[in-house]
Amino acid sequence: MNASSWSLRNLPWFRATLAQWRYALRNTIAMCLALTVAYYLNLDEPYWAMTSAAVVSFPTVGGVISKSLGRIAGSLLGAIAALLLAGHTLNEPWFFLLSMSAWLGFCTWACAHFTNNVAYAFQLAGYTAAIIAFPMVNITEASQLWDIAQARVCEVIVGILCGGMMMMILPSSSDATALLTALKNMHARLLEHASLLWQPETTDAIRAAHEGVIGQILTMNLLRIQAFWSHYRFRQQNARLNALLHQQLRMTSVISSLRRMLLNWPSPPGATREILEQLLTALASSQTDVYTVARIIAPLRPTNVADYRHVAFWQRLRYFCRLYLQSSQELHRLQSGVDDHTRLPRTSGLARHTDNAEAMWSGLRTFCTLMMIGAWSIASQWDAGANALTLAAISCVLYSAVAAPFKSLSLLMRTLVLLSLFSFVVKFGLMVQISDLWQFLLFLFPLLATMQLLKLQMPKFAALWGQLIVFMGSFIAVTNPPVYDFADFLNDNLAKIVGVALAWLAFAILRPGSDARKSRRHIRALRRDFVDQLSRHPTLSESEFESLTYHHVSQLSNSQDALARRWLLRWGVVLLNCSHVVWQLRDWESRSDPLSRVRDNCISLLRGVMSERGVQQKSLAATLEELQRICDSLARHHQPAARELAAIVWRLYCSLSQLEQAPPQGTLAS
């Protein structure tokens, strides 16, 4: 190790930027202030206030507000559940264990049906009830139930208030700035994505880029929620922001549709690629208007109206340009603060889908885990069994919704072991020698500030540092009055580690569904929703089905199963492109009854080839042949409406042709 590595510049306090110092000081002061206030309010376990302040330490105002609201609602719901369940079953340990396990299983199941703050509230409702109720097994007076429950809720609220106050005193980056920057970056990235997808090659990089764009647009919905809570102007513009996100998803769909047409177009004009690149370069400039775009794409205007392939590509390209320019104008209005509620229609939020099978399985896992640990604790009369139950409940509820639960549980195990060793040194080496809280704060403040800085400066270990900060309070366990019992300390820490280890074992036995199974369930749900789109009165609108489809696709974005990801993406793109054609056919009108019957026949062909179980290859081949015959016949028709219909039908042909390579039924794609 060279001498330069020991220089002062490499120490976290000197490497930190001003923004990092602001973040670290804000969270450190909030945690120390919460501990102090809870201590002098004579709450029996004030360290929970410090933990609560650590949990809501988001870098933005909107994140703190939304997280705090979810935490308060979840804590109140969990406290009420603990009072009701423990109050009626306190003298019946087996019934108490059964009711608490059922409640935590229900919360695990419920949080899978929601996102963001509502899911977080159900998580809090689950393990707050565990934190309050499981330690009650050793009490004899029913009146103590209320005292413990109100103390826990008060500690949580104290931590939230301290975190919110410090966010107002030392504010961080603006949610509005983060959202607008993300929208602008995605707006520019769509042009890069179009340039990549409109190439004739088919590579894994294209699939990964498409998944990345979809995931990034859906992630911006979280930024929209945080901006909604941080500033009144974005609450007024919420409908516009929803419409912008839907518009970016629609542009992603149009880019994919244009790619399918380019791949199925036997002889496009020779200068198509050069004109498209010139168009994308022009759209990247904020000074480009509709006249500039019209001049650039004018050479691609079809001269032969009977060439339905050329007409279809031309119409879809114009639609993409119009969408992109409209989105540019809306972004400019948002950035300049111009309030105009007439430009974009009110749009619902992004739709989502819940995997009910996985949610039920997660709830069952939580129930079985807690019943197993509780039965062992009751049979062995283990005094620290409540701690094992509490940590197991937290682990099962929190990590049922993550993509890699074993990795998260292993990290938590490592965190608990490190904290056990650290808290032993602090508790029996330092805390026994001090008598006032302010003396302990002189040690705690620089320690927390350093840990906060290290979390920011070491991204690879940010999750570890974050867990060390959050769980440190419950291991040091600053109480009023302080308690120093080595046997209880050792027993409690061992119980916490055993609880997480048993939760890990439960995940190993009752394993989450494989990515292949999840992919099949998502594909089946996609096909079921698409069949509904073919009905006369579909349940979902065009934009709702679009956002729901992209939500399905994003669910396996972190999967290591390349085949599962590929076929989920392929089915999503195919069904989405077909749904856009169906909606356009439904809106297409003609005074010619024969043409209307042709339109209805195309939709009926889709009903015949597609079902929830999958697609029949023989029916698919016959359908593609029939669609090609319809296109050729309509192209020779004397009515302009017929040639327009031929272009729409050819888009349907291009979308369905991607399924010719689908595996047979009984495999992943079916």
Curated annotation (Swiss-Prot):
It is found in: Cell membrane. The chain crosses the membrane at residues 23-42, 47-69, 76-98, 118-140, 153-170, 381-403, 410-432, 437-454, 461-483, 493-510. Keywords: Cell membrane, Membrane, Transmembrane, Transmembrane helix, Transport. It comes from the Bacteria. It is a multi-pass membrane protein. The keyword Signal does not apply. Its main location: membrane. InterPro entries: PHBA_efflux_AaeB/fusaric-R. One of its GO terms (molecular function) is transmembrane transporter activity. Pfam families: FUSC (PF04632). One of its GO terms (cellular component) is plasma membrane. Belongs to the aromatic acid exporter ArAE (TC 2.A.85) family. This is Uncharacterized transporter YdhK. It comes from Escherichia coli (strain K12). The lineage of its organism: Bacteria, Pseudomonadati, Pseudomonadota, Gammaproteobacteria, Enterobacterales.
